[in-house]
Regions:
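Short beta-strand element of the alpha/beta-hydrolase
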Residues: 31-40
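N-terminal cap/lid segment of alpha/beta-hydrolase-fold proteins
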Residues: 1-29
């Protein structure tokens, strides 16, 4: 039986930001193929979804790193997409320095934006495949639905542009929650436009067109109510890249949508099983 050891780790970016994470090792050793996972909006590396699946992936032989970007947790609205996405390279550097030869890069929710963004920007040869848990299609559309429709979204965009034109783009306001009952998050006006505005690049359906021939696995719970995961996200993603496998979990009772479904609450074993089956099919064995 594999014994999983856990290390709390920290990596420092070139501009001095410390990024924390947890490394799960099978029998205390690095595997040839490692997995690196990054969280979504408002989340941390220790979110329950990662805390439950990472040790099981390690039990299967894959050294697995769950790590923050600079825009983790309440910092989401303070840092631009590009800078945060590039932080993922620190996690890859860390795994490579420990002996990993190839890496499966993945993310949950907004992490399904930053993972393909990083690959599209760098074409990092260490990344052999991508995992998209609670895959988003287009965060711009999700933000419009969050705002309550096209008209209120246009007004939010207008206000942000007005603030930036007045030299006040770094002022803070509070964005509404993505779904009722979720947590509202503070945003700078300039970061709102960068991540959620009409010209934002936070569009996985576009980004995955630029990841080369790397295979991708996207998974969604049909009860997930988060706007950017809703149809036509699946259709957009599948049309964008023929190498993408999209898995929609079977419906469960109750059939009503619920925020916890975005985090695969109670369905973590299914996620691990789908992930391991896919990796085996690709021939990406741990060692």
């Amino acid at each position: 039986m594999t014994h999983v050891t856990t290390e709390v780790v920290s990596c420092r970016s070139d501009d001095g930001i410390d990024l924390a994470g947890a490394l799960f090792l099978p029998d205390g050793k690095m595997s040839r193929t490692a997995i690196a996972l990054f969280p979504g909006t408002g989340s941390e590396f220790y979110q329950p979804f990662f805390a439950l699946i990472c040790p099981v992936l390690a039990e299967a032989g894959y050294a697995t790193l769950a790590m923050n970007r600079r825009d983790h947790g309440q910092f989401f609205g303070y840092y631009p997409l590009h800078d945060a996405a590039m932080d993922q390279g620190l996690g890859l550097d860390f795994l490579a320095a420990r002996g990993a030869e190839q890496i499966v890069l993945g993310g949950h929710s907004y992490g399904t934006v930053t993972a393909p963004y990083y690959v599209a920007e760098t074409d990092d040869p260490r990344v052999k495949a991508l995992l998209l848990y609670a895959a988003l299609g287009d965060l711009r559309r999700g933000s419009m639905l969050m705002a309550g429709g096209e008209a209120p979204y246009r007004e939010m965009v207008r206000q942000a542009r007005e603030k930036i034109a007045a030299g006040k783009g770094d002022e803070i306001y509070v964005n509404p929650p993505m779904v009722p009952g979720d947590m509202p998050l503070p945003h700078r006006y300039d970061i709102f436009l960068d991540k959620r505005g009409p010209e934002s690049r936070a569009v996985p359906a576009d980004l995955i067109r630029h990841v080369g021939d790397r295979p991708l696995l996207a998974i969604r719970d049909p009860a997930d109510p988060f706007p950017a995961t809703l149809p036509p996200a699946r259709e957009q993603l599948e049309a964008a890249n023929a190498n993408l496998t999209y898995c929609l979990l079977e419906k469960r009772q109750p059939r009503t949508s619920r925020p916890s479904a975005h985090y695969f609450d109670g369905r973590e074993p299914e996620i691990v099983a789908l992930t391991l089956q896919w990796l085996a099919k690709l021939g990406l064995a741990p060692n």
